[in-house]
Curated annotation (Swiss-Prot):
The keyword 4Fe-4S does not apply. Residues 255-290 form the DMA domain. Residues 29-76 bind DNA. One of its GO terms (cellular component) is nucleus. This is Doublesex and mab-3 related transcription factor 3. It comes from the Eukaryota. It comes from Rattus norvegicus (Rat). Belongs to the DMRT family.
């Protein structure tokens, strides 16, 4: 029994040691082996001493390599034909003259194959130009950008990648070499464009690379560089989760995203578009999705001012931060991280509410889920007459608060007095004190600025509640 394992099973005695698997064979250079030299093949082909040898054994190796190349080309062609058989009959067209790329590929394959391989294998029929066009009609081809990647259309492996792999097909469609540009300007290619049957309405036109642009569901698409560019095909309809938007094809890839948004949404203010684009991190697609999803909630903008947070006409608190935002919070996406809650909408009409700088609604037409507290920094105030203390003001807007106190004109407001005094309880408020609406003012090292008191001490009354709760009695 040898050390590499025996191919036979001996029945006589027990096996002394388990059979060992043979080691993996490392490929060697066949030309060097013909001349008695052992050379590993990896990285050796360029530096082989016998690469130009014309002896009988080396010529046999050359013929064998040509046969293998012809077999690989035949397998690729069969794979392409099996892919083309999956194309529906509505996308098939009349056969036309082969494009220059396929003609060059066929000539290159024929020149590489040996006479022995040509006799053993049938000749490959030339593929019509419309087969590639019909296969490419199944997807939308992006705008070509010459010079990004020098693609060789004459190579058969690139043709296989176009039909098989969609990602590499898009990259090949975006890049064309100078040679292909000259071929596209020839009259033969112009003749090959008019080889579609009139009974296939899905195919609109063929662009310069031999691709067909498909019309999906009545949405006309056209390539901006095509000479057959019509006015009725100048827009691409993009369907979002809640609406559609018309994207003009005249937009170039090197335009800034803000200019693209201005072209798509001309009714929106440029400042709003800029803020949404910054909120999406400069991503144009995310900004378009946010603006599309905001259209579905446009009907919610008809709510009255009593159900919203109202800023007075002389309000200056949110001027420099929220001055560019849209008035209604329903313009924001439902899934956006920058969404303003539905109960916080800013309006210039403050005639029907208490003229406090902060007015919080306590009644809604339907129960809403609990929200996280809204932190308002005191750095938003500009003048010294602001009722905010130097501490943070935490505004709690919970579901329990809305259900327990069904009020119409009672609003919670911060008041700059000491932390032990509270307001006299309103006759409308219930006597339950466990879940009162409160504004907690944590005293965490910031000095309290003494301000002139608006109310007298007779208007206040101590009540069994936490020391940091304050309720404004507007009915007294």
């Amino acid at each position: 029994m040898n050390g590499y394992g025996s191919p036979y099973l001996y029945m006589g005695g027990p096996v002394s040691q388990p059979p060992r698997a043979p080691l993996q064979r490392t490929p060697k250079c066949a030309r060097c082996r013909n001349h008695g030299v052992l050379s590993w093949l990896k990285g050796h082909k360029r530096y082989c001493r016998f690469k130009d040898c014309t002896c009988e054994k080396c010529i046999l190796i050359i013929e064998r390599q040509r046969v293998m190349a012809a077999q690989v080309a035949l397998r690729r062609q069969q794979a392409n034909e099996s892919l083309e058989s999956l194309i529906p009959d509505s996308l098939r067209a009349l056969p036309g003259p082969p494009p220059p790329g396929d003609a060059a590929a066929t000539a290159a394959t024929a020149s590489q194959s040996s006479p022995a391989s040509q006799a053993s294998q049938p000749p490959a029929p030339p593929r019509p130009a419309t087969e590639l066009a019909a296969a490419a009609a199944l997807r939308w081809v992006a705008e070509p950008q010459p010079g990004t990647l020098p693609a060789q259309i004459a190579k058969p492996d690139l043709t296989e990648d176009r039909l098989g792999d969609s990602s590499s097909a898009d990259n090949a469609a975006e890049s064309f070499s100078d040679k292909d540009t000259d071929q596209r300007s020839s009259p033969d290619v112009v003749k090959s464009k008019n080889c579609f049957t009139p009974e296939s309405p899905e195919i609109v036109s063929v662009d310069e690379g031999g691709y067909a642009v498909q019309k999906n569901g009545g949405n006309p698409e056209s390539c901006p560089d095509s000479p057959k560019y019509h006015a009725e095909q100048s827009h691409l309809l993009i369907e979002g989760p809640s609406g559609t938007v018309s994207l003009p094809f005249s937009l170039k890839a090197n335009r800034p995203p803000l200019e693209v948004l201005k072209k798509i949404f001309p009714n929106q203010k440029p400042t709003v578009l800029e803020l949404i684009l910054k909120g999406c991190g400069g991503d144009l697609v995310s900004a378009v999705e946010v603006l599309l999803s905001s259209r579905s909630s446009a009907a919610g903008a008809e709510r009255t001012a009593e159900e919203s947070l109202v800023l007075p006409s002389s309000g200056h608190i949110f001027e420099h931060t929220l001055g560019s935002y849209p008035i209604s919070s329903s313009k924001w996406s439902v899934g956006s991280a920058f969404r303003v809650p539905d109960t916080l909408r800013f309006s210039a009409d403050s005639s029907n509410v208490v003229p406090n700088p902060l007015a919080v609604p306590l009644q809604h037409p339907f129960p809403q889920p609990p929200r996280y507290p809204l932190m308002l920094r005191n750095t938003l105030a500009r003048n010294q007459s602001s009722p905010f203390l130097p501490n943070d003001v935490t505004l709690w807007n919970t579901m329990t608060l809305q259900q327990q106190y069904q009020l119409r004109s009672q609003y919670v407001s911060p008041f700059p007095s000491n932390s032990t005094s509270v307001f006299r309880s309103s006759p409308v408020l219930s006597s339950r004190t466990t879940e009162d609406p409160r504004i907690s003012i944590p005293d965490d090292g910031c000095p309290i600025v003494a301000k002139q008191s608006i109310y007298t001490e007779d208007d206040y009354d101590e009540r069994s509640d936490s020391s940091d709760s304050r309720i404004l009695n507007t009915s007294s």
